[in-house]
């Protein structure tokens, strides 16, 4: 016989000791409505705090224009609902400027009354404008770009000044100090064109481990073709009998024409790294020294004016080593007097036929080294 409840009561009694109701009773259930109400109250509290902060800020008293524009703006906004607020402000400014002083007087009086009232209400008020946050811009310094190699990459040009100073400091105690490492990188026009090419390291300096670019034609002219003096004893010992006759002729030539030289330069007074170069003939003849003293002083001034136009050029010439560029030449180095004058054994005349060959050979060295041949 079936029960009136369809057997649900018996099932509830049978499952009365089920663990599910016991487990569910251990947790605290929260109503979703209460959660929503709590969030709403927090939001209202935050808005109240912000409103309190806004109300705490004391507004400035209105001036005459603000008093007049307070009602005039509303009227223009009703007449022109499509206009932007900025356009309304422009129209208000133009119309205020067009008003006469008599029409502005009531608004000026009202603004003065508001100012006095504001002072009475807020005696400690001080106008503090809200400054706009300015983004601190970092100072753009001179940073080395990725295209320009640093002193570590351009090892030769960075160490050229130091090598010049170290090799020639014993001969000249009054030289300038060592130039900075990046000086030749900024003033060497050849290194700029070499930086994009993989030039083979054919020419290596004896005192530096980096690649040295060959000098240009202007640098050869700045050297005045003065080479290492260490080769002179070897040449004198090797060809002493032949040199005896030539030196006598050379001394006569120099005495007869002391101001004749190649490329318009004086032969007897030559400047090498800030020093006066006096030929051997002037040293061997004491009488000639007193006669040539005045001419040496005048020629030194001429050389300084013509070939040392600025202190920077003189600084460059003082850093040039006379022995650095021997490795780029394909012929036997000679002394200064031999380079200046080539003696003809038969006629006894002198010529400067060696100069064009030197210039052409220097240009060929620079060209082939630049092309990487």
Swiss-Prot record:
GO biological-process terms attached to the record: gastrulation; Wnt signaling pathway
Domain Sox C-terminal: from-to ranges: 256-373
Localization in the cell: Nucleus
Residues of the DNA-binding region: 58-126
GO cellular component: nucleus
Keywords: Activator, Developmental protein, DNA-binding, Gastrulation, Nucleus, Transcription, Transcription regulation, Wnt signaling pathway
GO molecular function: DNA binding
Motif extent (9aaTAD): 323-331
Taxonomic superkingdom: Eukaryota
Annotated region (Required for transcriptional activity and interaction with ctnnb1), positions in chain: 324-328
Job description of the protein: Transcription activator. Doesn't appear to bind to the consensus 5'-AACAAT-3' DNA binding site, but binds 5'-ATTGTT-3'. All of the sox17 proteins are required for embryonic endoderm development and gastrulation movements, and show some redundancy in function. In addition, the sox17 proteins have distinct but overlapping roles in later gut development. Acts downstream of vegt-signaling in endoderm differentiation to induce a range of endodermal genes both directly and indirectly. Also represses wnt-responsive genes to inhibit wnt/beta-catenin-mediated signaling.
Domain notes: The 9aaTAD motif is a transactivation domain present in a large number of yeast and animal transcription factors.
Subunit organization: Interacts (via C-terminus) with ctnnb1/beta-catenin (via Armadillo repeats); this interaction is required for inhibition of wnt-signaling.
Protein name: Transcription factor Sox-17-beta.2
Organism for this UniProt entry: Xenopus tropicalis
